[in-house]
Amino acid sequence: MTQPSPIQAWHALMQSRDMTALANLLADEVVFHSPVVHTPQLGKAITLKYLQGAMGVLNNGQFHYLREIIGERDAVLEFATEIDGLQINGVDLIRWNDDGQIVDFKVMVRPLKAINLLHLKMGEMLARLPATAAGAA
């Protein structure tokens, strides 16, 4: 099965960590749903910052996708990684528009210990990132 171009682009930037490519993949009106923040985060700049932080925390050499369920305009990507000896399992739910830009990105994680660890690690990572993430317009 051929992957839609937004998913191909997502996989490529997960490898390259290219924040300009990530900024180009996100629609201006994108909404990000964090597993540790109860309110949706609105807009490209904040979504870019959260995803940049998540890449720094989760994409640590152990991160890999286990399976993908891909529709016409959305995908569910199940992932696994390990941080500080803790096995983490989660899903990225991604929806895109006619232009192939991501308009909705939701991350769900298990187990509860993983959520608590990610909350701590993401807080540390976000504090180190510049106020405006690179490439955000």
Name each model-derived stretch.
Residues 1, 13, 38-42:
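A short glycine-/small-residue-rich loop at the edge of a beta-strand within enzyme catalytic domains
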Residues 2-6, 90-92:
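A generic structural signal for ordered secondary structure
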Residues 4, 30-31, 84-85:
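Short hydrophobic/aromatic segments of transmembrane alpha-helices and their interfaces
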Residues 4-25:
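Short acidic-aromatic low-complexity motifs
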Residues 7, 26, 51, 77-79:
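Hydrophobic alpha-helical core bundles mediating ligand binding, dimerization, or RNAP-core interactions
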Residues 19-72:
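A solvent-exposed, acidic/Ser-Thr-rich amphipathic alpha-helical stretch
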Residues 55-137:
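A beta-strand edge to alpha-helix "cap/lid" segment located at domain peripheries
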